[in-house]
Amino acid sequence: MLCRALLLRAAGHRQSSSLPLQHLLDGYRCSREDDHLSYGEIGMPVPPFGCSFSAAPNFEHVLAVANEEGFVRLYDTEAQNTTKLISKEWQAHSNAVFDLAWVPGEHRIVTASGDQTAKVWDVRAGELLGICKGHQCSLKSVAFSRFEKAVFCTGGRDGNIMVWDTRCNKKDGFYRQVNQISGAHNVVDRQTPSKLRKKRQNLRGLAPLVDFQQSVTVVLLQDEHTLISAGAVDGVIKVWDLRKNYAAYRQDPVPSKSFFYPGTSTRKLGYSSLVLDSTGANLFANCTDDSIYMFNMTSLKTFPVAVFSGHQNSTFYIKSSISPDDQFLVSGSSDCNAYIWKVSEPSLPPRILVGHSQEVTSIAWCPSDFTKIATCSDDNTVRIWRLQHYPEEEKSVSNKAKLVGWVTQKKPEEQRGAGRSASPQSTPAKAFSVGSPCASSPRPAACAPSYSGDLPLSTNTPTVSLKTQMATACTPAKLSGASPRTSPKLVPSSKMSIKHWIARTPCSSPEVGKKTPSPRKALAEVTQSLLETSSTPKAQHSQAEKRAKRRLDCSKEDEAGQKCLQDCSCVTELDHVAKKSKLNLCHLAAGQRACDEGSLSLADLDNEHEDSTHSPKELSFPGSLVNPSGTQTPPPVLQSPCERDSDVVDKENSSPERKNWLSALGEKLRTGKAGSPPSSYTSSAKRQEAAVVTTSPKTAVNTSVSMRKICTYFHRKPQN
């Protein structure tokens, strides 16, 4: 009978030990009495940064919370009266307290602050026991070993890890580090060995290194000889042997073991939290790529054995904690919630603690009581979640009004899409109408990981709309009253010849219909005479021939005032000053008179347009020479505006129907012997003499234009 009773008792013990606890997670609630506001010196709300439960005997229910203004408060989670809820509070530092740790089994606590110091406090006596000084930047993490009460470690933004021993004597009233790991998580410098040697000699000295970009974010003591650390940028979890004096060596410290980043992100490589289970065999590393990696510390393999996902980690304030029975993992998140996973089944959807309105940062699971979880949030509150069991009718009627937090189940599809979901602080993607032919960019590739924490959001900007706007901006306005045939279609750039490119001036659109008048011709009246002129048979040209010319002005006054006096088909340029054009060869027969008549002012041209019988003024120069043709030739010192502005021969608007320019020059020389220049007159000067200039910005339409060689489009420099 005794043996049978023992067997039944053993079987019952096995059944009770294997009883799943996951169904109990849905019972966590946070009532209004457990929602506490974190405030500073003047009573203003400030965010809490760290929280931790005590492990001292008869003190396990005490929760220590540190906030941004350096205050530390002790909350009695078992107090029935709200007046006795805060057992003690004091301002530990004049700067923010980023982390705190209880001395194992003692009523002492160590705070790590932004004032570059760590302080040891006796919480019962309320006195300061010592100050640890040695860091050059803010302290981000502090940790004790479970087997040591006097030895602890700190990590800071200066990239250094320091080990402290409170049993050592104080120097100048401060505790000094007994071991130091400088540049523990420095990124490998890609400089030459000589530069590295000089840099190391300059920076390596008595003072620790300072590197804000290679901060030590978290430190952890596995035992009295093993330290684990992680950084902000290198993506490597390093294990250090404290029996080695790293301060005695001047070269970069080498860890005894390293766990390299196992994910696929290219820039989110930092770790915000490291947690060991009660056995010290499993390490949980909270990474900023929205994943928690589980490593086996007893194995020689360095890749993770499990990955927990579903939350969001966008800052280095997100912490994790393990349940007392090592079955569950809880973590804060940037999406205003806390998440609970089952360690043995990481693929299952996690439970969600819902209730905070801002990022949930530090979190602590009471090591002596499975039913209590503490969370800190950027909404300036500290909440204590308790495991409660109420009937369904009580949940919905009486207790829901008193609750500020509860547990929900994350859906499997939400967990799969958690990596692709954006942070609440990010701008959501724009939704476009169905059926719109748009291309969104960028998009993750098919081979991309399920999460995209390092990928930018897709803009969903319709590409077609952008192209349409660009095309609209480049298309000139249509002429009112113009017929469709007067506005030819645009010629594709792939089909355009060199004549099309020469015809296009900078910052101008292709020739479509009527061109806008030049800004220099602001006084000219824009009329519809161009359309009438272009419709006549005399002005009909092919599109290629029109594009072979430069842009011409097309006002009514231009056409009336620019007609050649010799009734030829010459064409002049738009602006003789800017383009330095010459008179057409047809003016050579008439001599310089045509140039003089064309050098009238704009008012004279307008008067000439109004009164066709008006005769142009003849310009005379003192000391001018009269050639046999009867025209006056100004001296070389005092030349007409036409000859001053003309430097090179303009062959672009010449017509093949006229004489050859050599024969015209010869005839000029034969008839102008009386006014011939000196014998030193060079051939280039002769070409300059034969050159003619446009005298008016007015233009006329050429009636016949033939294809010309490309060499004629380039001006020839005069030889002085």
Curated annotation (Swiss-Prot):
Region of interest (Disordered), ranges: 411-437, 476-495, 528-552, 607-698
Xref: SMART domains: WD40
Pfam families attached to this UniProt entry: WD40
Position of sequence motif DDB1-binding motif: 164-167, 240-243
Taxonomy, superkingdom: Eukaryota
Segments carrying motif Nuclear localization signal: 193-200
InterPro entries: G-protein_beta_WD-40_rep (IPR020472), WD-repeat_CDT2_adapter (IPR051865), WD40/YVTN_repeat-like_dom_sf (IPR015943), WD40_repeat_CS (IPR019775), WD40_repeat_dom_sf (IPR036322), WD40_rpt (IPR001680)
Pathway: Protein modification; protein ubiquitination
CDD domains xref list: WD40
One GO cellular component term: chromosome
Location(s), subcellular: Nucleus; Cytoplasm, Cytoskeleton, Microtubule organizing center, Centrosome; Chromosome
PANTHER family referenced in this protein's UniProt entry, alphabetically: DENTICLELESS PROTEIN HOMOLOG, LETHAL 2 DENTICLELESS PROTEIN RETINOIC ACID-REGULATED NUCLEAR MATRIX-ASSOCIATED PROTEIN
Membership in a protein family: Belongs to the WD repeat cdt2 family.
UniProt name for this protein: Denticleless protein homolog
